[in-house]
C-alpha cells in the first residue's frame, strides 16, 4: 500500500508538525515500506494455530496503590524557569487553542 505525500502532510497537520518537501517524501516512502511489511502478515498460513489472546507469559503485574508523600512545592519549583500562581508556565504551542 502506497502512502502518498498528501496523506503524510495531512497527518502532520493534524499532529501540528511541519516537514520540508524532502522530509515529506522520505516519510511517505518509509511509511509505505512499513505498511508493506505489515501486510506480509496476511500471507502467513495460520491454519491449525491455536487462537491466543496474549503473547506474554505474565499477567498484569501491578504495584500496590499506596499514597506516598511527595516533594515540597518549593523543592519541585526550584528548577522551574518560570511560574505563575503556583503553576509551571510554559510557552504556548497552539495559536488560539488549535483546531483539533
UniProtKB/Swiss-Prot annotation:
Upper taxonomic lineage: Bacteria, Bacillati, Bacillota, Bacilli, Lactobacillales
InterPro entries: Asp/Glu-ADT_sf_sub_c, GatC
The protein's assembly and partners: Heterotrimer of A, B and C subunits.
Keywords: ATP-binding, Ligase, Nucleotide-binding, Protein biosynthesis
Disulfide bond positions: none
Protein role: Allows the formation of correctly charged Asn-tRNA(Asn) or Gln-tRNA(Gln) through the transamidation of misacylated Asp-tRNA(Asn) or Glu-tRNA(Gln) in organisms which lack either or both of asparaginyl-tRNA or glutaminyl-tRNA synthetases. The reaction takes place in the presence of glutamine and ATP through an activated phospho-Asp-tRNA(Asn) or phospho-Glu-tRNA(Gln).
Organism from which the protein derives: Streptococcus suis (strain 05ZYH33)
Keyword hit for Coiled coil: no
DNA damage among keywords: no
One Gene Ontology MF term: asparaginyl-tRNA synthase (glutamine-hydrolyzing) activity
Reaction(s) this enzyme catalyzes, per UniProt: L-glutamyl-tRNA(Gln) + L-glutamine + ATP + H2O = L-glutaminyl-tRNA(Gln) + L-glutamate + ADP + phosphate + H(+); L-aspartyl-tRNA(Asn) + L-glutamine + ATP + H2O = L-asparaginyl-tRNA(Asn) + L-glutamate + ADP + phosphate + 2 H(+)
Protein name as catalogued: Aspartyl/glutamyl-tRNA(Asn/Gln) amidotransferase subunit C
E.C. number(s) listed in UniProt: 6.3.5.-
Family that this chain belongs to: Belongs to the GatC family.
One example of a Gene Ontology biological process annotation: glutaminyl-tRNAGln biosynthesis via transamidation
